[in-house]
Amino acid sequence: MAETKSQQSRLLVTLTALFAAFCGLYLLIGGAWLVVLGGSWYYPIAGLVMLGVTVMLFRGKRAALWLYAALLLATMIWGVWEVGFDFWALTPRSDILVFFGIWLILPFVWRRLPVPSAGAVGALVVALLISGGMLTWAGFNDPQEVNGTLSADATPAAPISTVADGDWPAYGRNQEGQRFSPLKQINADNVKNLKEAWVFRTGDLKQPNDPGEITNEVTPIKVGDTLFLCTAHQRLFALDAATGKEKWHFDPQLNADPSFQHVTCRGVSYHEAKADNAPADVVADCPRRIILPVNDGRLFAVNADNGKLCETFANKGILNLQTNMPVTTPGMYEPTSPPIITDKTIVIAGAVTDNFSTREPSGVIRGFDVNTGKLLWAFDPGAKDPNAIPSDEHHFTLNSPNSWAPAAYDAKLDLVYLPMGVTTPDIWGGNRTPEQERYASSIVALNATTGKLAWSYQTVHHDLWDMDMPSQPTLADIEVNGKTVPVIYAPAKTGNIFVLDRRNGELVVPAPEKPVPQGAAKGDYVTKTQPFSDLSFRPKKDLTGADMWGATMFDQLVCRVIFHQLRYEGIFTPPSEQGTLVFPGNLGMFEWGGISVDPNRQVAIANPMALPFVSKLIPRGPGNPMEPPKDAKGSGTESGVQPQYGVPYGVTLNPFLSPFGLPCKQPAWGYISALDLKTNEVVWKKRIGTPQDSLPFPMPVKLPFTMGMPMLGGPISTAGNVLFIGATADNYLRAYNMSNGEKLWEARLPAGGQATPMTYEVNGKQYVVISAGGHGSFSTKMGDYIVAYALPDDAK
């Protein structure tokens, strides 16, 4: 019996020592590699100490606990020196060490070490308590947060356009893209009482022939007592706004295939034909119409009252947007965002497949007669004469920069503001023409009636990073030095928010040109400077090895090694064969969700994101031909291997992830924040989202901590001093106090909420609605839900 116990004791000590040995060898070898690359000396030193602990454990010496206590305390001090009291940044530096330290102080472990050492157990207990105290302090004192309070002062601003208070008739509520509602039945005091009012299921789910990038991004619109929305496959639904009951639906019969880079619909547009702006036959046929963009390059006009096609529009209600395109392969040109609608014109643009080849459709922007569908004008950004009207002999220009995000419109100026993308291929630009460069990654202002250029402002010169203008711009009239200035806020992937006078494109907030890293790939070039707006969420400092992260110190070490192997000299580091760290990454700090502006309080709500990517140029060679194989199609995704046929390099584009699939950059990856537009200062900024739905195993209960998750979708704000946002990689809709960022309410969604919510009033009751259908490439739960929330009748 005694011999058996002795064997068990030796086995326990041996296993403990073997774990310490594994840790020590891993840290020593990996750490030595990191030091060779120019990284931190901590890891090899920690590895040597762990090997010392291993030797003592094998020899049965309790002094191992003394040495381990010293390692633990030194690690915590080093961690705070590197990242401050940031709980999530300290976690991978300490988690394995803390858990192993707890193991060592268990009586059945240390008592099996026969060689005594005075105070060893107590020393390790003290080290663990100090470490725990430091982590606890960090958990309640987040250095990344900004904790100010917005002024509650509000001066009613003259509206740029008139919208009934209870309606939400356009993607951004108004075509100025403000995403602000004057409703206040739901307010900061009672929002905690919100309950689910109704749920509608569209029945539109992922199909076997869909690409991975199938997404549910719609923001419904509401006119009168009806809600109008499109699904991922662009099926159009009209719902009773009070009950969620279907009134009618229309199916355009989208024929997608896995090569489509997107299958999505962000929204639809509404137009009312009246006797003073439309022919009598149009008014009789289709007085109220929904304009529906479809991913295969068609545009539908549907009667808003009954769901039937408007016979007097284009070809019996269907407009072919592929007409005069130089390439007409389905899925290469995709209108994914709702068009701008004026009394005369439909202004529509679309996405062009990223990084496929030098022979792709044009990114032309067109104006069609809103009643008949006749082409009124064209603005082809890559043509010598952008306004040249095509003919049977003249097609639009290959690979013109496109505008895939929603546009904004000022009816008083009759100007439409288009956020422009870059000429594709995106990540190598040595072959681009001056015309292709001219309007790329810019804000372009066009006369909505004629298509003539009013002005343009370029936010990235010779863009090699896919730093499109990704968001609907927001228009507002803001007090600047005692004067009211009509401005446009243009959020960029870089984190900059460019603020321009929307009459002429002149900067209102300075955006000085600053030097950027040099040294492009062979045959390409980079500009010496780029504009940096003074109003910005871009990172305040470049990434370093200290910013690398992981679930443990083991994968954090791998991330640090990879970081030092990549080319990175800060924002705008050129693409390379070595592999370039792109931060902000290809998703951008801002995406299609945009920002919300309260024009009365003159404040903005934003949800910036911080997630690095890695791009790597692949020279042509075997398996990587210059020209596309016959019948080659797109990859159906924006990440992974992208061929870039026609230029000297293919490219791989991927998030910068650890071996466990976690971001290599430490959290937060997503924030909710408020800006004072009078001072252009960030007043408050909070992490948003938990990893509840990003874990490798189901987590049925709500996690009690906020990490700051990646997100897609935007915020809305209301006169009730409450903002709403879904968007995060966990399945929640949340409400925050606009003044200070306090979370007031959240509701679990049945699927991913990667969409921007909206709010409206019907029959005296205010509702908040969001699409919960998930996002394919974001890996959130897919579904087909439209969910509405309202206050119970006794809680208003």
PLM region descriptions:
Residues 175-181, 204-210, 237, 426-427, ...:
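Short, solvent-exposed loop/turn elements at domain surfaces
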Residues 133-182, 530-538, 542-554, 633-638:
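N-terminal pre-domain segments of enzymes
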Residues 99-115, 120-141, 239-246, 264-271, ...:
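Hydrophobic or amphipathic alpha-helical targeting/insertion segments
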Residues 502, 574-575, 580-612, 617-619:
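Segments forming glycine/polar-rich beta-alpha architectures that bind adenosine-containing cofactors
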Residues 192-205, 236-258, 271-276, 283, ...:
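Extracytoplasmic/lumenal domain signature
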Residues 168-172, 212-233, 260-298, 331-357, ...:
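Repeat-blade elements of multi-bladed beta-propeller folds
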Residues 155-205, 220, 673-675:
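Mature N-terminal segment immediately following signal peptide/propeptide cleavage
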Residues 1-149:
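Topology signature of small-to-medium multi-pass alpha-helical membrane proteins
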